[in-house]
Amino acid sequence: MEASLLKKNQSIELTIEDLTHDGSGVGKIDGYPLFIPNTLPGEKVTAKIIKLNKNYGFARMENIETVSADRVEPPCAVYSKCGGCSLQHLSYDGQLEFKRNQVEETMKRIGKLNVEVPETLGMENPWRYRNKSQVPVGFVNGKLTAGFYQKRSHAIIDMSTCLIHNEQGDFAVQKTREILAKYGTEPYDEQTGKGDIRHIMTRFAHTTGQLMIVLVTTKERMPFKEEIVRELVEQLELTSIVQNINPHKTNVIFGDRTKTLWGKDIIEDTIHGIRFAISARSFYQVNPIQTEVLYQQAIDAAELTGEETVIDAYCGIGSISLCLAKKAKHVYGVEIVDQAIQDARANAELNELANTTFETGKAEEVIPAWYKAGIVADVLVVDPPRKGCDEKLLETILAMKPKKVVYVSCNPGTLARDMKILTDGGYVAKKVQPVDMFPMTTHIEAVTVLHLN
């Protein structure tokens, strides 16, 4: 069939050739690509066209004529509606291979790099891994509910469990929901801006078993607040109950004010033997098992002997910095979020690591200032946000010439782009190691080390 003859709502038969970065299947009609969610390579499907653009279109799978050997039955009852996961229909081995292929293809296409991409480091059990649940609250069929948003919408799906949240946090969300409903707590309405409760968040410390509940409310006063707190304490094994107040008409989750309603201000967890104090708003990796795997890759890549000066750009609460400080002469960390730097300093003190310096600011401004002041890194670690490293920071790296750059990435596209700039500037990379931090989703983390040639 010619692509020019395709029409909206038309049913067509085609074979899926590949998966996109967001996990949709891709099939072609006369060279014209159609993106079809919930399909896998090798599958012959019947699909209904829902949108046609000039160079590509979208279709909805109606029937699978030939089923992929990698297809599995998703165990989650709301998987087809929920926006939380996108790969439950693909076997876990298939997910790991998909992520490896994504990294390899991105390195070649964007970075023009021919590097080794080994098998993705996955989990023994890829379920129940998230130590943080962040669940919106709303009305569904006239009753208070807590669940995830539907795909491409802000409609909340009523759900009794989430299979990627750890059991303790998951149970705490459901119990909190029951108690709020019992006291007639009114959920926040995005349209009107009215209501009392916006989100229920839980944080669970994997190594200590400590559990925090955060109630995100529209105002400090909430009907029956004392009774709700008392019942939570009676019915759950908790370390902390915290209230965050967000009075703004926005879809941003947190407001600026946080107060402890019961118990401690923080919970405590460990990574590679380093203790971390985690507050309601601390940035902290959500998969504790794979964080150890990811950081071990970074530690191994740094090859520290105790004589090195290390700079950690985008250091957050110091999680990588402090793991490296055990083996370095001195570690300097920089982070734009001041609260994270305060947390990093507190965590350094908690672990009696005096060989650390943390400063608030933009990495691309602070590191050049350090360089001018004579602070030169032997090893420079970057763990940037999805947008990758700032251009000015990359220029500083090329001027400073650290022997090694250890790059921890949450976006293969910007990793490939930045690696190309560094390799063009005299660095050599041999391997990029994917790590599966978020099973059942398309997110990919990767670690590489670039050596000065």
From Swiss-Prot:
The active site is at residue 410. Its EC number is 2.1.1.-. The keyword Transmembrane helix does not apply. GO terms for molecular function: 4 iron, 4 sulfur cluster binding; metal ion binding; rRNA (uridine-C5-)-methyltransferase activity. Keywords: 4Fe-4S, Iron, Iron-sulfur, Metal-binding, Methyltransferase, S-adenosyl-L-methionine, Transferase. S-adenosyl-L-methionine binds at residues 285, 314, 335, 383. InterPro entries: MeTrfase_TrmA_AS, MeTrfase_TrmA_CS, NA-bd_OB-fold, SAM-dependent_MTases_sf, TRAM_dom, U5_MeTrfase_fam. It is an enzyme of class 2 (transferase). One of its GO terms (biological process) is rRNA base methylation. PROSITE patterns: SAM_MT_RNA_M5U, TRAM, TRMA_1, TRMA_2. [4Fe-4S] cluster binds at residues 76, 82, 85, 162. It holds the Pfam family TRAM. Residues 5-63 form the TRAM domain. SUPFAM superfamilies: Nucleic acid-binding proteins, S-adenosyl-L-methionine-dependent methyltransferases. Belongs to the class I-like SAM-binding methyltransferase superfamily. RNA M5U methyltransferase family. This is Uncharacterized RNA methyltransferase LMOf2365_1776. It comes from Listeria monocytogenes serotype 4b (strain F2365).
